[in-house]
Amino acid sequence: MRKALLFVVLCMFITGCDWFREKPEIATVLAKHFDNKLYNKFDTAIYLPIFKAKLEDQSKGFLNPKLISAFYAKNEYLPKLITKFYVTGQLDTLKSFVAQSKADGFNPEIFNATAYEKQLQALNRNQFKTIDEVYEAIADLELNTAYILNKYTNFMGYGSINPRNFFNRFYIKVLRPDSLKMDSVLNTENLVAELKKVQPTNRPYIELKKALANYRDSIGNEETPQVNAIKMNLERMRWRLPLQTEELVVVNIPDFTLTWFKQDDTLAHMNVCVGGKREATYVQKMKRYLKTGRLDDKPKNHETPQLFSVFNAIQVNPIWNIPVSIAKSEIYWMARKDPYYLSN
């Protein structure tokens, strides 16, 4: 009985010793990098509740909170991004890309630029007095890295908005990042490669970036019509079309022009007719029209739809007849009201 009791006590003593606790990878990486034994005290049992509480609190501001939460749940809530990318300097590269996003028309603060720089500096200084300070710093830096990486690659690679949710008559099925794509970015083994992959490289985009820099230097004011117009067009160029082709016919609706491109060459350029902006009170008038059914209440909407399609054939100088829908809903009704409408 005494031997059995001694064996149980001995087992409990051995299990409770730090000597036999498995050291987390983050402890090994940071202790070696900074030559500081403090990081060897890193205890995941203490760190995990701190990280989970911060994740729950900060995820409300994430672009894709469910995706990031699932990523950490799969990785046992460990600081995977810091472990993989801090020592190699790739987190500093991420900070640099975020700072340079101003050249693409973004405000770097939408990516928490200032806070991220301070968090990196705190770890770089390596002046923690207790391991508890390390837990707080690692948790904040890890979560901000995930937030920035997810948001930056989405915004730079696909645009900051989905135009189909923004424009009234936008029928282009622009490519958008799905959960598999975003998860692959968080699980990457080469963070810098992911950042480079989402940079727009087409010539018009590069030329617009140069124009933005020139206007900023010459005007010295960020909030001008010229600067804002360039920013909006940079955003439009980040929207990914469903198909990339060597030849492209582009209708510039505000400019009333059509241009036929073949790669960087212009094959044709001409003026075209486009629709006008719909009435300012369109929504209210449409509600009234749906109730009354009277054509007098129907609001005018002649906006040119934004669409993308592939030409199978082109007919030059076609015979154009008034579409039946226009004849019924507009011309017939106006002719009944005004006997001289057609002659005028």
Per-region residue spans from a language model:
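Alpha-helix capping and helix-coil boundary motifs
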Residues: 9, 130-137, 174-181, 190-191
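Cationic-aromatic interfacial patches
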Residues: 18-170
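Conserved catalytic/binding loops enriched for acidic/polar residues
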Residues: 179, 184, 207
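Well-ordered beta-sheet/strand-loop patches within structured domains
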Residues: 18-65, 143, 150-151, 155, ...
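Sec-dependent signal peptide recognition
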Residues: 2-8
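C-terminal motif of bacterial Sec signal peptides marking the signal peptidase cleavage site
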Residues: 13-16
